[in-house]
């Protein structure tokens, strides 16, 4: 595994994700947003500035709809894709 990556879990879930040590990382704000988000069963979720895809992973617990992540950093998009 790339030594820039860590393998962490999303608090309050049994979901794990990769995070880069040199990029923005999931934090308490992410966990709170993920916990309190309201997503219906077939909703499409768009996360602008998705970074590692953590919020999309939280959303995946609620919807069978599309999960779309957008980020300006190519590396962030690649990491989100790996996590999803």
Q: Where are the language model's segments positioned?
A:
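Conserved SAM/SAH cofactor-binding pocket of Class I
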Residues: 35-84
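Class I SAM-dependent transferase core
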Residues: 2-40
